[in-house]
Amino acid sequence: FKIVNVDSFHLYGNTGRDKRDVVNVEHIFNNWTPVTFSSSGTVQPADPNLLGAKTAMWADIADMGVTERDNYERLMRQAAVLSEKTWGGTDEDQTYEEYSLKFEKLKAGPGVELASDIPSETSLVLDYDFKNVKSGEDGTVVYDAAGNGYNGTVINADVKEEDGKNWLDLNGDGSLTTGLRSVDYPYTVQFDLKVDKKGDAQLFDGRDGRLSIGSDGKLKINRSYFEQKFDYTIPENKSVNVTIVGTQQVTKLYINGEFKQALTRTTNSETDYNHLLSTFVFPLTTIGNGFDGKIADLKVYDKALSPKTIKLAAEGKAVT
């Protein structure tokens, strides 16, 4: 009979579970070949009964906060290393570090829209300081100070100077559109926020999710059909600096440069619905929809800034 190698020990992923949530890609690269079977050793190379190999994912605990993006991130890495080891030959000189660089460069193929990488000249992807704007018939253009050309359009809102800053002044009917979809993790999104009137509003919205503020003044993320709330109340009529940091493991909130909370899964229990996975692809399509307040100094980085750097940025100091 013919065999396809889908070895459980090496090739099986189990998203969100304590047993191999993420397949050990480095171990596979360094120790596995298509003729390796964990339970029975190996077979001879070029054995005509061995047809090849597959990787597998058992993703059956969606209620724990697992989204299609979580599965995609894991499966993409599994499939890439399997392809390298199955079809890439046996180049003994290639190191895992070299393979990793090649993977990051190639990663997803053309037309794979789950990936949300934004081309940028530097790690600063987007910078709306609202200093350089131009009014027109179709709204006010806000120019991207990051130099990437991701200019935004303000509809039914104004840009005003207050407290030495230029603010996007929203009255509940206006918004800002960017022409972008989302920024993938790792990322850092930082902005100044002033709530004039509490109410449910979407601060950042798009196909991949939503960062909103509730009538209680608390920020919350919506991803797939999950809603997770940060336990911090944004004060009314007071400016605060908000920083959201997203990685493959966690979504963090900083206020005025100080760490407040991390949304993350802290238990392996499959019935704990209070601590969900919290990977959050940050939406950038529409800003301020339904919000009655002001936003200033919006910056988006395609990396997770360190706590020290976040503190400096919140104080208005230049960061790289």
Would you name each region that the model predicts?
Residues 118-150, 156, 160-320:
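Extracellular glycan-associated modules
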Residues 1-126:
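Flexible, acidic glycine-rich loops studded with aromatic residues
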